[in-house]
Design a protein with these regions (language model features):
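Short loop/turn segments that connect beta-strands within beta-propeller blades
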Residues: 135-137, 186-189, 230-233, 269-270
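C-terminal motif of bacterial Sec signal peptides marking the signal peptidase cleavage site
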Residues: 9-12
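A short loop-to-beta-strand structural motif that recurs across blades of beta-propeller domains
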Residues: 129-131, 181-183, 225-227, 263-265
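Short, solvent-exposed loop/turn segments at conserved positions within beta-propeller repeat blades
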Residues: 124-125, 173-179, 218-223
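Bacterial signal peptide processing site
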Residues: 14-16
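Aromatic (tryptophan-biased) beta-strands that constitute blades/sheets of beta-rich domains
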Residues: 50, 54-110, 139-149, 191-197, ...
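Blade-level signature of beta-propeller repeat domains, shared across WD40, Kelch, NHL, RCC1
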Residues: 250-270
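Repeated scaffold domains used in trafficking and secretory/extracellular systems
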Residues: 69-70, 79, 107-117, 149-161, ...
């Protein structure tokens, strides 16, 4: 079995402060007053109508039950060329020890593994819900719920690009139907766009590089891979076999640093 406690120590590896003040998990939970699916959360209660009015928060439940593999037609995407530069046994070490030695970090806030960010948004897991805030305004735009194992409600496991939400639905355990896949969901039109095949993703985070998603899958007695998915269709366009399951991925410049259960990989991306 995978020693998840080893991974959790990487929590201190992320950025702890932001340029603006955001609600933490407890204050988020306290500020939400749900009255059903149509309930809204207004960040600035004093804002009136007009330019200063905060947008209504959209509450969306993404139902993935019975949704099989979906790949719409889309432009072909060339995968990145991934070349293993180094492969080192780590003695089942703590992930943060290796990342700190490389002066790397994940875009995290705090130490609870529930708060991360990108250039446009901040993402906060609170209970079963994912809150998405706009960096510039601090407004909460979306509150999303979708099925995924609580082991995986951490890391950088969500991404919003042009109103399209990219997420992971994971089951912690051996391979089984309808588990460990990525999906893309149109939040404005409440529509699933694609759903990758089973057993394509159970990494604790994924990376978006232009038109490619880098993620990975593996488990005890199963083969372990890094996968590249077409961002627009969810199709696997390339794979790279590793010796152990990839769990955390950190890109820096043209290098990808991959921590696994018992190996550390440095991979060149071209």
């Amino acid at each position: 079995m995978i020693v998840w406690t080893c991974l959790l120590t990487l929590a201190g590896c992320g950025k702890k402060d932001m340029d603006y003040t955001m609600q933490n998990e407890s204050s988020v939970a306290e500020s939400v007053r749900e009255t059903g699916e149509e309930s809204v959360l207004i960040q600035n209660e004093d804002a009136g109508e007009g330019e200063n009015a905060a947008p209504e928060t959209k509450y969306i439940t993404i139902d993935l039950s019975g949704v099989g593999e979906i790949h719409p037609k889309g432009d072909a995407v060339l995968p990145l060329t991934l070349k293993i530069v180094s492969e080192e046994e780590n003695g089942i070490d703590f992930a943060n020890e290796w990342y700190e030695s490389k002066q790397l970090s994940l875009p995290m806030v705090g130490k609870e593994w529930n708060n991360f960010y990108d250039d446009e948004y901040q993402y906060i897991w609170s209970g079963d819900a994912l809150y998405i805030y706009e960096n510039i305004s601090g407004n909460c735009l979306y509150v999303l719920e979708y099925p995924t194992d609580k082991w995986y409600i951490n890391g950088n496991n969500a991404c919003l690009l042009d109103d399209i939400f990219y997420g992971i639905s994971v089951t912690n355990g051996y391979a089984q139907p309808d588990s460990c896949f990525m999906f893309a969901y149109d939040l404005e039109n409440n529509k699933i766009l694609w759903r990758s095949g089973d057993q394509t993703c159970n990494t604790m985070n994924f990376i978006v590089k232009k038109d490619v998603i880098i993620c990975g899958y593996g488990f005890t007695s199963e083969k372990d891979y890094l996968y590249q998915l077409n961002l627009h269709t969810g199709e696997v366009i390339a794979s790279l076999e590793l010796k152990k399951q990839p769990d955390l991925l950190v890109p820096q410049d043209n290098m990808l640093y991959v921590h696994t259960y018992s190996y550390n990989y440095t991979i060149e991306m071209q």
